[in-house]
């Protein structure tokens, strides 16, 4: 099933916009309201699975934390394994780490060293694309382990914050269900 305009509008309307959160001047797009609606949540997963079902994906990677909520069901729908990428010291086995820039400092993400095998074709899934820093770090981790990643899927794309362009420079094609301006 290809996403219809009516389905995408339904998803967009299921996402609440919160003014002045987490600070004044920010319009926060709250994907948790989509999760509260089982029809919207199921539709978002179905549309992503449909898009990638014939893409030869062997693993789905989701970034902490809301990427888990969308990545794991997409992996199940595709019949492949799910790999979490987490904040430091949250994964029990041997990991590798990648640092990335935040607005005021840096952060790190980790992945198990045995979670991705050389040649795995990986789809990265997250709830929202803003500047692309988190996904760029995730892609670097996957590639360091020998995985091939060319696509990333999102529920929301804050299209004017530059994430899609940033990831395109890394050879990543981005797909999102719901575009919003990112003011």
Swiss-Prot record:
Protein name, entry field: Adenine phosphoribosyltransferase
Uppermost EC category: transferase
Any one of the GO CC terms: cytosol
Metabolic or biological pathway, per its Swiss-Prot or TrEMBL entry: Purine metabolism; AMP biosynthesis via salvage pathway; AMP from adenine: step 1/1
Keyword Chloroplast: no
One Pfam family recorded for the sequence: Pribosyltran
Organism, scientific name: Citrobacter koseri (strain ATCC BAA-895 / CDC 4225-83 / SGSC4696)
Catalytic activity: AMP + diphosphate = 5-phospho-alpha-D-ribose 1-diphosphate + adenine
Gene3D superfamilies given in the database record: 3.40.50.2020
A GO MF term: adenine phosphoribosyltransferase activity
E.C. number: 2.4.2.7
Name of the gene this protein is made from: apt
Protein localization: Cytoplasm
SUPFAM superfamilies membership: PRTase-like (SSF53271)
Keywords: Cytoplasm, Glycosyltransferase, Purine salvage, Transferase
UniProt keyword annotation of Zinc present: no
Primary location recorded for the protein, binned into one broad class: cytoplasm
Subunit text: Homodimer.
Family: Belongs to the purine/pyrimidine phosphoribosyltransferase family.
Main function: Catalyzes a salvage reaction resulting in the formation of AMP, that is energically less costly than de novo synthesis.
GO process annotations (BP): adenine salvage; AMP salvage; purine ribonucleoside salvage
